[in-house]
Amino acid sequence: MTRFGLALLMILVIQGLVTFSEAQLKMGFYDQTCPYAEKIVQDVVNQHINNAPSLAAGLIRMHFHDCFVRGCDGSILINATSSNQQVEKLAPPNLTVRGFDFIDKVKSALESKCPGIVSCADIITLATRDSIVAIGGPTWNVPTGRRDGRISNFAEAMNNIPPPFGNFTTLITLFGNQGLDVKDLVLLSGAHTIGVSHCSSFSNRLFNFTGVGDQDPSLDSEYADNLKSRRCLSIADNTTKVEMDPGSRNTFDLSYYRLVLKRRGLFESDAALTMNPAALAQVKRFAGGSEQEFFAEFSNSMEKMGRIGVKTGSDGEIRRTCAFVN
């Protein structure tokens, strides 16, 4: 290769490295273009969280569901239109997701200060972190620079979001597809320490587990009887809500893992964590461990999840309104 050719190659390599670097997530991505972006998100969260602590559970679920379909690109926020009536938001796993109006409020606050700068995907990620911190949970790094996706697909949501009735094989396959492992599965399931669930997400365990009117033997019988007599009175009940971690639904702590070991997790997916030796070992470790250790490891898994399939650089767009592509 001539000296000129070598020099040209080096220039192209350097340009490529710069482009690659610019296209990555980084801490403080908006420092120059919207210096108060993260403060604005945090302020809106703090203004609402005292009156609505359940917002934290809604946002972390939204973030989880968004990242598992086409990556963390805000596609869960897109409304149906005449040209696309089959969006993620309308898929059964997302019909009970909450927080859409709140994300719109944050977006409006940001647009008033820095129009067209901060992505809806970053808003979900930042607001989730800030809401968990606001209820006393862990914090974690949120590198920013995500861009918003233009595609939202009903079928992809059905195929990729881990279901509450999933067995261990189903769960670890879906997590593995996203680059997550057994430890991430157990840690992220720990978010069930906050929030509520509709009876319809687990009533088959109470009334018709194998199709013959039976009860799931992996669910503590006393707990199941209590649910049937006091909360979910029939398999047709799709409106009643039940705390996933009774008595502390707004407290981010280790009690979820202790409930799982007592066979009192609401979902089949909770019970599934005890069906695999590696997962069970992690559940036992957290159930008997320190909150500080759990918080640190949960934070690592949340940051890892927040990097799934992100769109950066010139990929995607910055939506003007989170519910519609530009």
From Swiss-Prot:
The active site is at H65 (proton acceptor). Heme b binds at H192. InterPro entries: Haem_peroxidase, Haem_peroxidase_sf, Peroxidase_pln, Peroxidases_AS, Peroxidases_heam-ligand_BS, Secretory_peroxidase. Keywords: Calcium, Disulfide bond, Glycoprotein, Heme, Hydrogen peroxide, Iron, Metal-binding, Oxidoreductase, Peroxidase, Secreted, Signal. Residues 1-23 form the signal peptide. Slightly expressed in roots. It catalyses: 2 a phenolic donor + H2O2 = 2 a phenolic radical donor + 2 H2O. Glycans are attached at N79, N167, N208, N238. There are 73 peroxidase genes in A.thaliana. This is Peroxidase 39. It comes from Arabidopsis thaliana (Mouse-ear cress). The lineage of its organism: Eukaryota, Viridiplantae, Streptophyta, Embryophyta, Tracheophyta.
